[in-house]
Design a protein with these regions (language model features):
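Amphipathic alpha-helical interaction segments
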Residues: 16, 25, 44, 49, ...
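Short, compact, well-ordered microdomains
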Residues: 55-91
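Short, flexible N-terminal segments of the mature chain
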Residues: 12-40
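Acidic, low-complexity, intrinsically disordered interaction modules
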Residues: 38-58
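Negatively charged, low-complexity tracts enriched in Asp/Glu with abundant Ser/Thr
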Residues: 1-16
Length: 91
């Protein structure tokens, strides 16, 4: 598995400003966590998405950082403990 964080410098509240990815050996996302400026963490697992290149996903405005498994698991665990989606707006 490969682990990445993509970070964008924008103020849009309805777009994630951080994206944490777990990619399998083919480059397909298996788990991801979207982080929004309002403090909402949106974990997604059991993904069925095509292979992706984190640098392409970041575009010209994003920064890509390689993570290790422990770092990704820490973020994943945090995201599972926090309210998400609509309920996250109230915390």
């Amino acid at each position: 598995m490969q682990y990445y964080m993509i970070e964008w410098d924008h103020e849009e509240e309805d777009e994630p400003w951080k994206l944490y990815l777990e990619l399998d050996s083919r480059g397909c996302p298996r788990r991801k966590v979207e982080v929004y400026r309002v403090g909402v963490y949106q974990p997604c697992d059991d993904l069925d998405e095509p292979p992706m290149d984190p640098r392409e996903a970041a575009g010209s405005e994003g920064n890509v950082t390689a993570l290790n498994r422990v770092q990704f698991e820490d973020i994943w665990d945090q995201s599972r403990q926090m309210p998400d989606g609509f309920m996250g707006m109230f915390f």
